[in-house]
């Protein structure tokens, strides 16, 4: 939040926070507490109300919405250029085939951040999906990543990496 407060002074573009529905108002509370000067907007309500709010994005420094509402409203967000985009609880995009993952990758932001305490639970696909949001293409296409890294690790062709992976999963 301190970072957002500082950035808002330097760049007029809005910043986007996408989080689970249960955390939307936590973000509001934290902004009020630590950066009361920030102009923030919570995008919620019915379709008409959200559409109206989204048309006002440029009046705010921080926009907060949830994964489910972003999925419903992505057509309104696609033309908006954000300064920074933060995914809170980024494990919500761990499945690269999920609507959440596909939707957030349509957003336009100068920089993207994934906030998570659980980057990977079951497979390297999960890590790839989060990295592909933050740095698109850095870990190759999903197919190439699987062929180059995931399958050899699963087949035990890279014992050193597998050891670290097992330690992380436990």
What are these regions (language model features)?
Residues 1-157, 164-170:
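ASCE P-loop NTPase motor core, strongest for the SF2 helicase catalytic module
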